[in-house]
Structure formats: structure tokens, C-alpha cells
Amino acid sequence: RMMSRGLGDVYKRQLQDQSMFYGVDKSRFKENKRAVPEKHMGPLIKTQMTRCIHCTRCVRFATEVAGVSELGAIGRGEDMQITTYLEQSMQSELSANVIDLCPVGALTSKPYVFEARPWELKKTETVDVMDAVGSNVRVDTYDWEVKRVLPLINEDINEEWISDKTRYACDGLSNQRLDTPFIKYNGKFEKASWSEVFKINKSKFENSSKDKVCGFVGDLTNMETGYIFKEFFDRTLNNNNYDSRSDNRFLDNSERENYIFNSSINGIEDADLIFLIGANPRYEATILNARIRKAFVNNNTKVISLNDSGDLTYPYKNLDGQTQTIKTIFEGSEEISKEIISASKPMIIIGESLLKLNSAEHLFNLIKNFLKKNNKFTEDWNPLNILSCDAATVGNFDLGILNNEKNLLEELKSNKFEIVYLVGQDNLEFNKKGEFVIYQGSHGDKGAEIADIILPGSAYTEQDGYFTNLEGKIQKAYKASYPPGEAKEDWQIINELAEVMNNRKLFNDKEELESSMFNYLKLQQEKQKTVNKVKTNSEFQNEKLIILLKDYYFSNVIARSSKTMIECNNSKLNIKSTGTEG
């Protein structure tokens, strides 16, 4: 073997010498080598179009799945190129999925470039919290820093897609973080120890009447945090002045079906009529909107919207946006009433904007009564759907973190409380006048700005926790990294505060907390009544229903801290008409 290898090497060298002396010194390739200049597709997608093999997967995705026809092919033969029509940023909220689809690396992730190698990353399967859909994702960390978020296949929820915000808001986990307790002295924050802030909190709670204390849970808190927060108020402070709503939203929690997406995300494809009332699913639940488009493309499902919501990526019939129109439809005196009655599986999707109206209770009960009267509630179909926007909303409602007896928000705005305890709540709007505000959270945002004491907590990737998505499915988000500095897990902070106040923890460990929480959820489900007919007590007001949308790229504290989301917002032009409006 050694001899043959040696002889082979000798002959190779001889051939190389002959080629060097007598061979052709120019390439026989006569054609021009193909090279394509890089294309601008926005802050998320880096292009190396010379690699492109013209499979047109990206074009088909943009046209068929995302529903925004902004990619196409120009030229013929070897001159063919994939490009955006106007050489501008892609406008779809699902645009970055083309990175996963591209088989050759012509389209790659711009924010992730040169960050890490795949084999260097720790991979954790978890749940997204950028909206209430609960998309399944994989979080990749390098040295406990989140580097990227990728989709996991779950055919019942997000299929294989995730929104751009889900994928790229993760850099906000490294910015504006609260990493140590703070106390405000003379209008300035100073670092403190945990024992110091706990002692001050204990003193404040003991010197205030229990009726003068209130608490609010935020939109990204997991269920364990919400439950121990509720237990802290019920058992330690002995009051129920707590809520998870940052607005005057109507909620009837006597039945679970009154606040979840009952038809399920998968059920969208089975529906034969979809009626949107005060909802804009493209921005409130991007993945759910892709399902509605899929139902339209595959089944030609009819979509009606009370409001003109702009381009939803599928055609729809829009109405005048008046509550009087809702009233006449669900009193059965409109053509649309007959369409709903004749549909075998209608879907009524109610947005949060409707639930904030003065006549929300009247309209909600009217809609539900109409559907029950016409036998639309069956064993295998529930047509009533609430489109929640935030990851923690349904879980907080399941845990009973709300107060329907008092209007806590009005009392807060009237400055009737002495102590306000905020856990991840950054959406409250009130003029502070002497209240002592305790803020517990992961980022320095609106809540931290008005606080007197800051307790640094953990983000969703830094602690295990359960979230219930808009259709009522409980999913567990797993810990992928650690909180920075002296920050702690949220449930642990509340547990230690209770121990300082009562010399006794609320729960000995997290397993005991989870067990107690699930027992409570079972009891709640047993307590919820089965009501045959909903009573209508509230009065009707004819008013214009305006869809109140958050800024899509800045909808929560993590997104607001993300540099990538800032770039996306800056590159977002007025969305061009794609010819799909109703």
C-alpha cells in the first residue's frame, strides 16, 4: 500500500509538471461568470444572491402564505434574478420565514450574522410571549445570552412559521435590564441590597391600611408569578385589590368560554364564515391571521369585518364600524344575520377593542344569545372567540387575577391608594400623587420610571413558567438563560417578601407552588357555572368602534428594548396596497 501511494504521488507530480510546461494557461470556460449584486430586503434579511438557484420558495411564501406579493423574478434564463419589486424592505410581518425556507443560504439572518456557530449554541425548546398565540419556538443561547429564536413545528398553533417580532425581538433581552434593587432618593435611583428593599417594603405595608394597597400584574408574567402574587394579596395582605387589566375591559369570567378563542386556531380552516368585530388579526395575532388567509386560499372562506382594517392579506367585506350595526345584525334583521344562521361553522372573532366600549357587556351578551338561540353551540363547535393580544391575559383570567367588584383603575386614577405594587405592569396610565410604587420587572421601562422601589425580576427565557394561549392551551416555557446581576425569578421575590413580612414563606419550593396552582385551576373550572342564557343588564350606546392597536414593533417591554425592532419600525413605510382589500 505504501509503495502504491508513493508511486501515485510520483505520477501526480509528473502530470502536474507536464501540465505546467505544455498545458493551456487559460480557462476553457468561454461564458461570463454569473454574479448577482446583493439586494436590499430590509433590516432582517441579508442577501447573497449569487448563491440563488431560483427555486422560488421565497416568492411562493410571500405570495401564498404571507399574502404580501413583494418578491418576484425578473429576467430570463441565466439573467433571472429574485428581487423585491421596488428595491425596498419587505413589509410582511412574516417576512423572515424565507430565511428558513431558502435551501442554499442566499437569504440569511442579518441580525445573527457573525454572532455564533450552530454547534456553540445551547438549544432550548420553549414558548413565545410576543403575542397570545403561544407559538412554539427554540431559543439558542451562547454563554447564557440569547442569540436567536427559531420556529418549532406545531401544526395546532403556529405550523412552521413565526412572526418577525417573535424571531428578532430577542436582542431586547440584553438591553435596558434591571440587574440590582434600586431605591429612589430625592428623585434619583440608588443601588440597594435585597434586605434593604424588603425592609422598606415591610415597613410601608405595615404602616398602611390594607384597603389602601393595590396590585397589578403585567402582560408577560407567567402563571406561577401571577398565582403567587394573588396568594400574597389574599394571604399576606388579606385584601383582593388586584387585577391584571390595564384598561376598563369588560369581562364575564363566570364561564371560561367568555374569554378564550373557543373555535381553536386549527378550527379556522374548518370555518365557512368568519366575522371580525373590533379585531385586526394581522397586527394583534400575526400567526392566526396567516391561518385565516390559509382558510381563504384553500376553502374560499368568506370574511366579514365590522371595520375597514386596511390590508389583512385576504379580501373581506367591511361594514361601517358602528355598534348599531352589530346590534341590528345580532337581533337578526340583516342579510349578514341570515348568513351566520345558514353557516354550519361560523366564527365570530371579538377583539379587545369591542370589550373596551361603554356598551361592551350589552353587545357581548347580545352576540352570545343570538348564537345560542340559533343552535350554533354544538358538541364539536363553539363559534364565540375572543382575540386576546398579550401572552399572560388568559392565564391571569383563569387564575382569577381580576376584581369585578371595584373599579381599581378609576380608584387608582383618583389617587385613593397609598401603595401600588406592579409586577411587570408597564401599561398603566395614572398621575402619581404621593403613592408609594413598588415595581418588579425585568426592564427599565414605564413602570420602573414611576417606581420608588425597583425589584429586578427575570424575563421569560430566564425562568421556567406556564403560559395559557388565547385558545386556552397551557404550555410551559423553559429556562434558557440566567437573569443578570442580582435579579431573581419573579415567584422567588414575592415568596421572600412574604417571608420577611410574616416569617413564613407562601410556598416551600416551586413544585409546591405549581401543585397548588393546578389544584386551584381545577377548582375554578368546577365552580364556573353552565349558563343557558346570558342576562343583559347593561344599556346600549350607539358609538363608533375604533380598533385600538399598539405599535406593532413596540408592544411590550422586550420589544421596546430591541434595537432590531427599532430598525424594523424605522424601515416600515406606509404599507402599500397589495390589491387584497375588500
Regions found by a protein language model. Name each.
Residues 514-582:
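Long, low-complexity segments enriched in small/aliphatic residues
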Residues 119-131, 142-166, 299-332:
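Terminal amphipathic helices with adjacent charged low-complexity linkers/tails
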Residues 33-44, 77, 176-187, 270-272, ...:
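Gly-rich Lys/Arg/Thr-decorated short loops/hinges at beta-loop-alpha junctions or inter-strand turns
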Residues 92-115, 226-227:
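Amphipathic alpha-helical
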Residues 1-11:
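Single conserved hydrophobic/aromatic residue that forms the stacking wall/gate
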Residues 242, 246-528, 578-582:
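Non-catalytic alpha/beta scaffold blocks inside enzyme catalytic domains
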Residues 9-37, 65-90, 108-130, 140-156, ...:
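Non-heme iron-sulfur electron-transfer modules
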Residues 145-219:
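Catalytic P-loop NTP-binding/switch module of NTPases
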